[in-house]
């Protein structure tokens, strides 16, 4: 699909619109250490993955209540640490460009609602439509979230561009039927060095 055929842009949050990599690394490293796990092994899957899925993967033998406590601990660590959460390069410019062109945009994130709002506010980004892991039954790589956010935006998914920075997120976008754009070298229909490049594509 050509860029001119795109009628809405659906963004991932962490690593795509919001640079929270350092916070994610710190929070999950602390959590892993507290639970006697390897921070490197946990970090290898934590980025872009729903926190509950990561917790379940590394604590498969604990009770549901213990797993809930572990998940709450991660959320506490992440919500309390926004010291260096910033917009990714080009994020504000791209949003301004989309709004100038009359193209709706929205955010779908694997983060829970509380954390998403904290990070978006820290980065100075205010989506009118936000779908989080709290709003869906199945997180990424399931396409449910992107299908849901496209419905809320009011644009058929085939005319949406999903912008992601992880393989699991792009898998969700691809499965939804959207055109995909990938940051950080991940394979997608459109590969982006940064969001400035997407500004150029929409305005050239």
What are these regions (language model features)?
Residues 2-93, 99-101, 112-117:
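N-terminal helical cap/lid subdomain that shapes the substrate entry/recognition surface
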Residues 1-8, 96-99, 103, 112-204:
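Asp-based, Mg2+/Mn2+-dependent phosphohydrolase catalytic module
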Residues 19, 107-109, 182:
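Hydrophobic residues in well-ordered beta-strands that form the structural core
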Residues 18, 41, 84, 106, ...:
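A generic secondary-structure micro-motif detector
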């Amino acid at each position: 699909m050509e860029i001119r055929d795109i009628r809405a842009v659906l963004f991932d949050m962490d690593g795509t619109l919001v640079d929270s990599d350092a916070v994610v690394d710190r929070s999950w490293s602390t959590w892993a250490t507290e639970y006697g796990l390897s921070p490197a092994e946990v970090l290898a899957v934590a980025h872009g993955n729903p926190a509950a899925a990561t917790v379940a993967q590394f604590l498969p033998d604990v009770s549901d209540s213990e797993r809930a406590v572990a998940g709450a601990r991660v959320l506490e660590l992440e919500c309390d640490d926004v010291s260096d959460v910033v917009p990714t390069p080009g994020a504000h410019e791209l949003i301004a460009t989309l709004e100038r062109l009359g193209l709706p945009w929205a955010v779908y994130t694997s983060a829970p609602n509380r954390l998403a709002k904290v990070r978006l506010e820290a980065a100075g980004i205010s989506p009118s439509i936000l779908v989080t892991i709290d709003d869906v039954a199945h997180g990424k790589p399931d396409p449910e979230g992107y299908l849901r956010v496209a419905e809320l935006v009011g644009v058929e998914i085939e005319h949406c561009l999903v912008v992601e920075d992880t393989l699991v997120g792009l898998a969700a976008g691809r499965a939804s039927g959207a055109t995909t754009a990938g940051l950080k070298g991940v394979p997608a229909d459109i590969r982006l060095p940064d969001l400035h490049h997407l500004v150029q594509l929409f305005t050239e």
